[in-house]
């Protein structure tokens, strides 16, 4: 037994480690080749701007991610056009390392190298993972810490090396400084400890060190109040540091009722038979929250989805069949290992879904929050690949990742995607000099922050997001600037609040100008001028257009349809 425990002690890089490094390197190359070369939608523009200049982003913050972003973007050497690619490269590298660690984790779970390779490849090529790996978001780095924690605990179980536990504590703390989803691995870590406590005996003081290193891992959070005190241009810490960490500016969803957001009442009946009562809430949870907001995402990744660009239905059900076969066979292999992987799957999926209590409807897909459950499914894919027999085994194992690669390549290769950058720039270009631009959501705000803060484009335009400044303060800003400076609204703002300004909105390019009279609103010359002189586009053949880009361009076409 002692010889088994000491097997591989102190050797973090052996033959198996080199295999994992090769798998991780291949995944990293794939992500670097297909990553976005500029800003992307949603939080990416905010993360690039706050990371590059060490500003304060939305609660509860991601200080370690921002510090690493800042480190990566230092290699731009003052070239602002390299900042976004370098920031995106952080996600690509983190996701690639995660794939390598997944391979090593499956080897620790006694999966053959062939099965581990198939499982790691299917994880690397699935929709959600690939999407997060090619843009500036926190989830790739957060999954790296989740994967590292599980792998290190499994190494501790096999080798009995007490040094692994403080390292697990450190990784857990650093993961919290990236995203709180890292805490979801704690039940699995506990099961690994219970399964190995008799073979890998550890003295009590080691656990004290592990807790100490966990708190050391939390120290990057100190940068949030320090930078907030410097009052940078982007500072989303309102009030105290405690309220920032608690995300008090956001609405909190209760565990019950499941139908809780009153403004969604008209949509509840689409998913259940009533808008109140325990039975109706249970039906809503099963149909919408568990089915539409979780089960649908699992099928997107391992069964199939409609390709958003070419409008072709591509089915790749083979990975899902391997996962189901691996799930069925895993418990026969090892009861402890089965429940360890099941803990990852449940905590990263069903239990997380229960906690989040998704409102009806979300403004965007939320598949990225369930990436830990996809990680667990990838382990079962590897085990399923191990258990496949017969003369078709080689064909099946090769076909599983290849179908994912073929199905996902077209809408995950963002190396030629410039639509986000161009649409954001055209918002700024649609404004006259020294204008005030009022925006509403993430997609008409964060890419503009990136352009102004990083590329220093149209810094004369002041951008105010009504969700951050508040309605009352926004009205004060409009009133104080009207007649002195041009005031513009984004399309998102106009869609929701146009009724507050009847007859006073004139379309100019991608924005709407607030004018004094209805007569001015009917003047089409400013629109023609912007189309002729201000609007800029990259001419990129075969560029993939994300759904948000298509929606913006659809609105643009509708606004310009009357101008010939």
Predicted regions and their residues:
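N-terminal membrane topogenic signal
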Residues: 8-22
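Transmembrane-helix signature of polytopic, membrane-embedded enzymes
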Residues: 17-20, 102-125, 334-343, 347, ...
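Extracytoplasmic catalytic/substrate-binding loops of multi-pass membrane glycan-assembly enzymes
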Residues: 35-47, 57-69, 290, 415-419
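Membrane-interface interhelical loops and short amphipathic "cap" helices
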Residues: 41-50, 76-82, 128, 356-366, ...
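Short hydrophobic/aromatic helix or loop-helix immediately within or flanking a transmembrane segment
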Residues: 50-80, 92-93, 293-302
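Loop-to-helix entry region of an early transmembrane alpha helix in multi-pass inner-membrane enzymes
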Residues: 63, 67, 77-100, 132, ...
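Transmembrane-helix motifs of polytopic, lipid-linked glycan transferases
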Residues: 89-110, 148-152, 321-326
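ER/secretory pathway lumenal C-terminal domains and tails of membrane proteins involved
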Residues: 92, 135-136, 140-143, 155-163, ...
């Amino acid at each position: 037994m002692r010889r088994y425990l000491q097997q591989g002690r102190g050797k973090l890089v052996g033959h198996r480690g080199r295999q994992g490094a090769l798998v991780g390197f291949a995944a990293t190359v794939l992500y670097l080749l297909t990553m976005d070369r500029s800003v992307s939608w949603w939080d990416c523009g905010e993360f690039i701007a706050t990371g590059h200049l060490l500003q304060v982003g939305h609660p509860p913050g991601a200080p370690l991610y921002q510090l690493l972003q800042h480190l990566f973007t230092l290699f731009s050497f003052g070239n602002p056009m390299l900042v976004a690619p370098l920031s995106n490269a952080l996600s690509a590298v983190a996701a690639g390392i995660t794939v390598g660690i997944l391979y090593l984790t499956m080897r620790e779970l006694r999966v053959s190298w062939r099965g581990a390779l198939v499982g790691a490849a299917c994880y690397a090529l699935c929709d959600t993972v690939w999407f997060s790996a090619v843009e500036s978001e926190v989830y790739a780095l957060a999954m790296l810490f989740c994967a590292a924690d599980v792998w290190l605990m499994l190494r501790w179980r096999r080798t009995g090396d007490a040094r692994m536990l403080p390292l697990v504590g450190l990784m857990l703390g650093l993961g919290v400084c990236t995203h709180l989803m890292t805490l979801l691995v704690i039940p699995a870590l506990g099961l690994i400890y219970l399964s190995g406590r008799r073979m890998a005996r550890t003295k009590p003081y080691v656990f004290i060190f592990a807790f100490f290193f966990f708190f050391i891992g939390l120290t990057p959070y100190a940068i949030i109040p320090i930078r907030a005190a410097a009052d940078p241009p982007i500072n989303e810490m309102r009030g105290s540091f405690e309220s920032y960490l608690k995300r008090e500016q956001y609405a909190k969803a209760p565990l019950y009722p499941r139908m809780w957001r009153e403004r969604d009442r008209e949509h509840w009946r689409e998913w259940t038979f009533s808008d109140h009562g325990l039975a109706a809430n249970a039906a809503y949870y099963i149909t919408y929250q568990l089915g539409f907001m979780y089960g649908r995402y699992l099928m997107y990744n391992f069964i199939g989805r409609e390709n958003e660009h070419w409008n072709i239905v591509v089915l790749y059900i083979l990975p899902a069949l391997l996962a189901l076969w691996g799930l069925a066979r895993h418990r026969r292999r090892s009861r402890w290992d089965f429940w360890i992987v099941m803990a990852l799957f449940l905590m990263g999926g069903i239990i997380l879904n229960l906690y989040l209590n998704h409102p009806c409807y979300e403004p965007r897909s939320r598949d990225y929050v369930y990436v830990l459950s996809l990680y667990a499914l990838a382990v079962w894919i590897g085990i399923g690949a191990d258990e496949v027999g017969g003369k078709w085994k080689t064909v099946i194992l090769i076909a599983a990742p290849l179908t994912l690669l073929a199905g996902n390549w077209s809408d995950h290769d963002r190396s030629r995607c410039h639509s986000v950058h161009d649409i954001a720039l055209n918002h700024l270009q649609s404004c006259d000099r020294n204008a005030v631009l009022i925006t509403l959501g993430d997609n008409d705000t964060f890419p503009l922050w990136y352009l102004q803060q990083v590329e220093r484009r149209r810094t004369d335009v002041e951008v105010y997001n009504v969700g951050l400044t508040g309605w009352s303060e926004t009205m004060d800003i409009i009133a104080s600037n009207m007649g002195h400076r041009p005031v513009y609204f984004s399309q998102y703002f106009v869609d929701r609040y146009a009724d507050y300004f009847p007859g006073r909105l004139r379309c100019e390019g991608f924005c709407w100008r607030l004018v004094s009279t209805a007569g001015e609103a009917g003047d089409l010359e400013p629109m023609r001028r912007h189309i002729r002189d201000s609007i800029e586009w990259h001419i990129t053949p075969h560029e993939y257009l994300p759904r948000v880009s298509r929606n913006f361009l659809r609105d643009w076409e509708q606004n310009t349809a009357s101008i010939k």
